[in-house]
């Protein structure tokens, strides 16, 4: 390198002001080296002759030290931006912070992180649906980014949706095992993807399991609208001896957690069926809570031995009937919610869905053709239901009100306390604005629920305060993974190189359970 050539070091993902600072230190080092060389030349050289500068061991050591300072400055600048300097740029992802609560309060219970994440099944990827994603869709890259994300957020229990069966067997099972997790996987036999629950084996061990096949589950007088092939998975995870010993306990009345996950019907006109599926979620959780009590707690009738959670992709927004039927009880459909579910009852699903493999693949497009007897929009401004359709809607509300169970969204009760700018932007439940950012659709579809008994004589239509929730359920929310509002997202959809590895964003709650 000639002495008059300027040295410039460009660090990927480093802010401009940080880059200037780094290059300034390099330039200063270069000038100092030039001055030393010039001095050596004046002392040793003869008039009319040029001599080479003498390179001493001290000079070499000095240059090496300056280079090390430069490398450290570059590395520190990247770390400050949440960028792993040891990771190739194409495997980077946007690292979101945890927003903490109760920081001044000591931890006295069992603390763990609970994640839900729709990872976008490789089997469902079609280039036309992800026109801006480029190489981000390639599994050999995407798998590494997803794995880096799991390592970074370091959750203790992970609920996953859209996990390819092939990838789970050949990749995820081994990779999670290396990280200290055990897991369970379930799918419908006609689908290439399913759901999974992973847990840190040093904290829990599985003592029971329940599988949910929505098409086979009865919902009183309400029949399935169509074949969906959707499934759910619920586990009983008992606290390990290590958990109890770390809390100074030999035993505890609290045994562990019940954790479920699912991926509900995706179809735009599937609101009625999704609402039925949400009834199945609560009904099956009630059954499982009682079964675990019989098998693990000698049928003592005390359901408080276990903390029940249910997480996943519900393909429903906070102002739609599937979500509201679980969280706002007694159920009463009105305004937009009533219009949308009423409209969905008028939609006629193709019989091709009944039994044909792949007919219902998520993101696969509608196999039904619009016609004169089909509604044009799943969210019309107005819908005039006929008598039969009105009766179907009323029956659904009655069905949910007959079940003494409800769900509480953890982000709904707590997120406004850490990120009020993105709590309830487009809803009155305090939920963040988005968890899905695809090319053609953006919104909130994913939730982490706490499930509990509901007294039909009580009114639980409004969102409770964080304090009331924590006191009543012995669950403390110590933090939430930050969810970006829509105005912070790019114009293009996800996944995208250097941003996110799925069209969904992971959601995580940092929880403390009082044992």
Curated annotation (Swiss-Prot):
InterPro entries: CCR4/nocturin_mRNA_transcr, Endo/exonu/phosph_ase_sf, Endo/exonuclease/phosphatase. Residues 40-52 have a biased composition (Basic residues). Involved in pre-rRNA processing. Required for the final stage of 3'-end maturation of 5.8S rRNA at site E. Its EC number is 3.1.-.-. GO terms for molecular function: poly(A)-specific ribonuclease activity; RNA binding; RNA endonuclease activity. It is found in: Cytoplasm; Nucleus. Keywords: Cytoplasm, Exonuclease, Hydrolase, Nuclease, Nucleus, RNA-binding. Disulfide bonds: none annotated. Residues 1-54, 353-381 are annotated as: Disordered. GO terms for biological process: rRNA processing. Pfam families: Exo_endo_phos. This is RNA exonuclease NGL2. The lineage of its organism: Eukaryota, Fungi, Dikarya, Ascomycota, Saccharomycotina. Its main location: cytoplasm. It comes from the Eukaryota. Residues 21-34, 369-381 have a biased composition (Basic and acidic residues). Present with 3570 molecules/cell in log phase SD medium.
